[in-house]
Amino acid sequence: MKFLFLFLAILLAMEPVVSGRRHMLRCMGDLGICRPACRQSEEPYLYCRNYQPCCLPFYVRIDISGKEGKNDWSRENRWPKVS
């Protein structure tokens, strides 16, 4: 019984082991991921600090003009309209 408590104390005192996968570098306000090549469902947009493309999901829209216009993605044309 003492051996069991000793084993549990040692097990709880050890730091958790992280798998060998590298930490993913996030970009565009945590909407994208920096990768060497984007997946089929992602679009490359600009570049990250490590000179890899920032891969955004296809449904993310980026307005590079900085102002909202009268296009399909403007505030007035969004669905659903809240009154």
Swiss-Prot record:
Disulfide bonds join C27-C54, C34-C48, C38-C55. InterPro entries: Defensin_big_dom. The keyword Signal applies. Residues 1-20 form the signal peptide. Keywords: Antibiotic, Antimicrobial, Defensin, Disulfide bond, Secreted, Signal. Pfam families: Defensin_big. One of its GO terms (cellular component) is extracellular region. Its main location: secreted. Belongs to the beta-defensin family. Has antibacterial activity. This is Beta-defensin 119. It comes from Bos taurus (Bovine). The gene is DEFB119.
